[in-house]
């Protein structure tokens, strides 16, 4: 065959073109493409096929013709956006990127292998810049918060509704008002108070009804209300901007009372206990017989001084050799009263007043106009007239124009002389003579 014939030349050109059109398939026996003999069998170095030069057909495959793309374009992209998700994934440990194909999540990118040079070629970190708002205005990283003015509102809850500051009464019949008070009671600041820093003071007066004369009395007064008139319950609610949560806790009412007691000095109360042979008396209280188990327990409990809740000073006067029917003066030696000294007198004759021991009896203490104290026994069927006769007998020279009052606040006069002690309810009571 003639090698210079046109058929031979055309055939040779077709073979060369076919070989040139074949893809550049790497040689599996090449040292550069052998599996990485590391301790990680599932990891291998990925070299894209686009990194190889095109086969020119002049000779067999030569590894020396392997060319790598320069890494500068990718480095430029990394420098432009080092915090992108792609760059974060590509920056692995070591100087080459290693993809794990065991999970089937390998990348199909045809980018060339990037060679990182440690500290020198590490992705460039952008300097921290001031953040920008949506209007392209520079915003400082440290915002200077302007001081907000604190608005204080006083919410007073009544049995028939509630008031805010000096506003009119808002009844609970209105669902909106009931919801407002429910939010306040749950220690949250309602939206109606505005997007500002708010302090709410809650005062509970649920035992009394709201009247127009009481409007504004709590908001302007700083004195706490009496304990017997209402339950003192105050809560501080601090509400910041765009927040309806409570930032400051509620102060317990018990803790508030303990704090007030610590701030105030203790008051020393003095009691005078007179012990008789058949019972005892405490100050000006009625006679207490030892036949009652509760009264006997009082004498055993008294020295502990735990009954009254405050530091006490108890002065005991022993009169065990006398009965309680005898007249005694209980003026204390430490008293600085300007009243005239009390005198001890003998009890009048009981011939005009007969006491039946078998009938129900009671002890009544009489405080006469001259400050003399007389304690005697009566039957419960005796009348007020009998008590007056007893006083008249003890003071034969005294005036009969006087009133008998039941000691109390205020004193109650006994105007019905024919009323019995039982019906008047003055058993074991203290009666005062007043002209």
Curated annotation (Swiss-Prot):
Q: Which stretches does UniProt call biased (Polar residues)?
A: 211-222
Query: Acidic residues compositional bias: what residue ranges?
Result: 252-265
**Composition bias, Low complexity:** 49-62, 130-141, 312-323, 333-349
Indicate the transmembrane segments per the record.
none
Can you give the residue ranges of the SEP domain? 150-211, 268-343
What residue spans carry the Basic and acidic residues bias annotation?
112-129, 231-242
Q: Which residues form the signal peptide?
A: none
Keyword Repeat part of the UniProt annotation? yes
Q: Which Gene3D superfamilies match?
A: Phosphatidylinositol 3-kinase Catalytic Subunit, Chain A, domain 1, SEP domain
Region annotated Disordered, chain positions: 1-150, 208-265, 311-352
Q: Supply the InterPro entries for this chain.
A: NSFL1C_SEP_dom_sf (IPR036241), SEP_domain (IPR012989), Ubiquitin-like_domsf (IPR029071), UBX_dom (IPR001012)
Per UniProt, what is one Pfam family of this protein? SEP
Q: Any idea which UniProt keywords this protein has?
A: Repeat, Ubl conjugation pathway
* Every UBX domain range: 357-434
Name-wise, this protein is Plant UBX domain-containing protein 6
Q: Which organism is it from?
A: Arabidopsis thaliana (Mouse-ear cress)
């Amino acid at each position: 065959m003639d090698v210079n014939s046109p058929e031979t030349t055309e055939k040779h050109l077709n073979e060369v073109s076919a070989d040139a059109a074949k893809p550049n398939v790497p040689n599996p026996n090449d040292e550069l493409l052998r599996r990485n003999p590391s301790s990680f069998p599932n990891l291998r170095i990925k070299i894209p096929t686009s990194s190889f030069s095109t086969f020119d057909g002049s000779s067999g495959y030569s590894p020396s013709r392997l060319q790598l793309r320069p890494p500068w374009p990718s480095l430029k992209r990394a420098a432009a956006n080092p915090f992108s998700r792609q760059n974060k994934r590509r920056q692995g440990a070591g100087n080459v990127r290693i993809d794990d194909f065991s999970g089937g999540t390998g990348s199909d990118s045809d980018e060339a292998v990037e060679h990182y040079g440690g500290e020198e070629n590490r992705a460039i970190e952008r300097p921290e810049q001031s953040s920008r708002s949506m209007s392209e205005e520079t915003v400082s990283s440290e915002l200077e918060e302007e001081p907000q003015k604190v608005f204080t509102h006083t919410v007073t809850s009544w049995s028939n509704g509630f008031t805010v500051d000096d506003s009119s009464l808002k009844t609970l019949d209105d669902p909106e008002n009931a919801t407002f008070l429910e939010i306040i009671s749950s220690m949250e600041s309602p939206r109606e108070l505005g997007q500002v820093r708010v302090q709410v003071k809650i005062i509970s007066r649920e035992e009394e009804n709201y009247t127009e004369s009481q409007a504004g009395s709590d908001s302007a007064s700083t004195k706490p209300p009496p304990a017997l008139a209402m339950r003192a319950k105050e809560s501080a609610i601090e509400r910041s901007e765009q927040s309806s949560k409570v930032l400051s806790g509620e102060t317990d009412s018990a803790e508030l009372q303990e704090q007030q007691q610590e701030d105030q000095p203790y008051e020393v109360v003095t009691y005078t206990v007179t012990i008789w042979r058949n019972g005892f008396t405490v100050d000006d209280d009625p006679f207490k017989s030892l036949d009652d188990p509760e009264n006997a327990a009082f004498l055993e409990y008294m020295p502990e001084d735990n009954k009254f809740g405050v530091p006490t000073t108890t002065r005991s006067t022993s009169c065990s050799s006398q009965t309680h029917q005898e007249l005694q003066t209980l003026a204390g030696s430490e008293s600085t009263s300007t009243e005239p000294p009390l005198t001890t007198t003998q009890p009048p004759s009981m011939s005009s007043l007969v006491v039946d021991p078998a009938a129900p009896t009671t002890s009544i203490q009489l405080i006469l106009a001259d400050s003399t104290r007389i304690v005697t026994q009566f039957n419960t069927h005796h009348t007020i007239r009998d008590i007056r006769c007893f006083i008249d007998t003890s003071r034969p020279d005294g005036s009969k124009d006087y009133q008998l009052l039941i000691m109390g606040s205020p004193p109650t006069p006994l105007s019905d002389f024919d009323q019995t002690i039982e019906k008047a309810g003055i058993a074991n009571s203290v009666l005062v003579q007043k002209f």
